[in-house]
């Protein structure tokens, strides 16, 4: 669990589209991060 948020924490990693494709659930989380950085766990 802490592994995913780790790279998510880095806004620069958002450019990694391939990584997002591997994790279909990540795209949703990334959207939340952009909307509310505080709610990255939402």
From Swiss-Prot:
Q: Which UniProt keywords are listed?
A: Antibiotic, Antimicrobial, Fungicide, Immunity, Innate immunity, Secreted
Name where it mostly resides.
Answer: secreted
What compartments host this protein? Secreted
Q: In which tissues is it expressed?
A: Hemolymph.
| GO biological process assignments | defense response to fungus; defense response to Gram-positive bacterium; innate immune response; killing of cells of another organism
Membrane-spanning segments: none
Give the record's GO CC terms: extracellular space
Induction is noted as:
By bacterial infection.
Q: Name the protein family.
A: Belongs to the lebocin family.
Explain the purpose of this protein. Antimicrobial protein. Has antibacterial activity against the Gram-positive bacteria M.luteus (MIC=22.7 uM) and L.monocytogenes (MIC=90.9 uM). Lacks antibacterial activity against the Gram-positive bacteria B.circulans, S.aureus, and S.lutea, and the Gram-negative bacteria E.coli D31, E.coli ATCC 25922, and S.typhimurium. Has antifungal activity against A.niger (MIC=90.9 uM) and T.harzianum (MIC=90.9 uM), but lacks antifungal activity against S.cerevisiae, P.pastoris, Z.marxianus, C.albicans, C.fructus, and F.oxysporum.
- From the Swiss-Prot or TrEMBL record, give the protein name: Lebocin-like anionic peptide 1
**Source organism (scientific name):** Galleria mellonella (Greater wax moth)
List the top taxonomic levels of the source: Eukaryota, Metazoa, Ecdysozoa, Arthropoda, Hexapoda
């Amino acid at each position: 669990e802490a592994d995913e948020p780790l790279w998510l924490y880095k806004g620069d990693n958002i450019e990694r589209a391939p990584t997002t494709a591997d994790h279909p659930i990540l795209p949703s989380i990334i959207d939340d991060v952009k909307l509310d950085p505080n709610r990255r766990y939402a």
